[in-house]
């Protein structure tokens, strides 16, 4: 019964659309009505600026961490349940009951699950993700490639549960980023205003 409660609470925690909440409360802006119309961190940066975007990023990570940690908080001593219950938060973020079962791409929320499951691995994954952003200037590419590398890393360490969950999340990322991949192919994917990719695009535009 407690485990069922954990799954339900994890869904409702994961479903909190912090991008929408922060935008409306502090910026009087609905980020769903501009940019990519997504509720996640990238569009929050675009619509709310670096401070608002950073707040959304941290909150989306922490809600994944809190949701995944529910079994531990309720005294269930099976660490592997952190990953399983955490998936309910990903489902909540992707299909949020608060915004008519629409949602984001669950990148930050997935990172929060990893933080609860293996904090050192989270630090490594975050460093990889940020390095890929500096290299490509595209969050979509950094998120997808980062998940591929996390999956490979978990294979090296024979963490089969993490490998399975990472593979599942990779499929979700690929599906949710389909529009991004089409824009990449067309050469007009949105970029962050820094990094090598942005520099090269600007340099080509001047030549």
From Swiss-Prot:
GO terms for molecular function: acyl-phosphate glycerol-3-phosphate acyltransferase activity. Pathway: Lipid metabolism; phospholipid metabolism. SMART domains: G3P_acyltransf. It catalyses: an acyl phosphate + sn-glycerol 3-phosphate = a 1-acyl-sn-glycero-3-phosphate + phosphate. InterPro entries: G3P_acylTferase_PlsY. The keyword Transmembrane helix applies. Pfam families: G3P_acyltransf (PF02660). It is a multi-pass membrane protein. Keywords: Cell membrane, Lipid biosynthesis, Lipid metabolism, Membrane, Phospholipid biosynthesis, Phospholipid metabolism, Transferase, Transmembrane, Transmembrane helix. It is an enzyme of class 2 (transferase). The chain crosses the membrane at residues 2-22, 47-67, 72-92, 121-141, 155-175. GO terms for cellular component: plasma membrane. GO terms for biological process: phospholipid biosynthetic process. Catalyzes the transfer of an acyl group from acyl-phosphate (acyl-PO(4)) to glycerol-3-phosphate (G3P) to form lysophosphatidic acid (LPA). This enzyme utilizes acyl-phosphate as fatty acyl donor, but not acyl-CoA or acyl-ACP. Belongs to the PlsY family. Probably interacts with PlsX. This is Glycerol-3-phosphate acyltransferase. It comes from Lacticaseibacillus paracasei (strain ATCC 334 / BCRC 17002 / CCUG 31169 / CIP 107868 / KCTC 3260 / NRRL B-441) (Lactobacillus paracasei).
